[in-house]
Amino acid sequence: ISADILARTLERSGVKTEILGFTTRAWKGGQSREQWLNDGKPQNPGRLNDLKHIIYKKADDPWRRARRNLGLMMREGLLKENIDGEALLWAHNRLMSRREDRRILMVISDGAPVDDSTLSVNSAGYLESHLRKVIDWIGRFSQVQVVAIGIGHDVTRYYRRAVTIMDVD
């Protein structure tokens, strides 16, 4: 709902917006985990779940054309686990392909990065550490400004420019 409201508001102000989403393709791993098991479970394997990156609205599409896609966010069974760092890199790369003079990547988050398959065999905090590294890299080397809104979750521990909304009502 918040992405929908923000996109409509920004579009009315003449700001191009893209709405992206991310999740994993499976619970408790997928082909990545199967490959790791087939390889004899090497130590420190990294991500062990397959990513699903979703484009709900492209920047050049008007909100009216994309509004039905926004309903897919709530489709039962679609959203699983969250590998935030790689999703942030994907969104950043999409934004860098745009020609606008100013580029802002706004993250709306309801929780910390979590993927049980990955976290069960890597060091504690693996996904959070990766997210922090990605945010730091973008902040140092990119022209993209990252801002975040936490919905019921304090995102200020990850993002420097962030607000937290505890009660949406």
Enumerate the predicted regions with their spans.
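Acidic, glycine-rich A-domain
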Residues: I1-D169
